[in-house]
């Protein structure tokens, strides 16, 4: 029986193999050997004097024909027990990596017959006692990474709530938010290099692409409505989180029920209602289009309008901006076919100068939809 273990690090000299879990355009990348009818993740032996990450790059290129890709180490794995590459059964170590492949050459310089892109993991594995466990570990680490970067966004909103005061301008608020995101682990910002989209007052009705966004120098008053939309990332792992903040009598009002302005209170209550309706309505089989129609009808039935400049209500969380799919008309992708998606209705009362926004990332577990 083979035993697979995982380590953060070991002595470099122990690393004899590299396995590269790979994806391209949201699909798993697997290889089929010329002499087998099974599938495997690319990988292989380290050559003498070779840097282990170079081993991973070389094996990826040889076995998949990848020519444009990003690759990163995930962790160290070990296998104990006799197998085709370990006659003695002692513990052997390898580097587990992840690669996002952007382009293939179409030619393979290896014993592999072909490369296959799959929506689901294969049933017929070449190494059924090893590689499924490696992929399970990768998925566990990836989820932790998404949770951590999203947590940094949530903590940044809590930080700025305790910092905002009358007299501050929006440029200062943006700067503080972006600095806090970086302090909490983000290394960059995925949406047009802007970490915090900040609007106040009648600007909260503005819906604009990040490409055209310019932060105003508007000054916060004693009674103010502010929307902040955060887009941190670490590597190619995204966070996406937005909240509407109310300032009354010079203080941030934490409890929606304590907001004095009736219009602002109703707007934030509607955002809560929308997210509750999402959790009630959405299933893995619900298409993005069906959710689009249902939620837009729900918005109108409750006396509000959708302010989004594209008319959509959210998007999938991916690793490249151009790969996103949206909660929009015509998108027949099922919610359960993506790992994570955002729900971010930007709404207002008709003809009002104030807009409201609340954004979370959601994902499915066996029992239903969960907030990340």
Where are the predicted features?
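Unchanged
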Residues: 46-70, 77-133
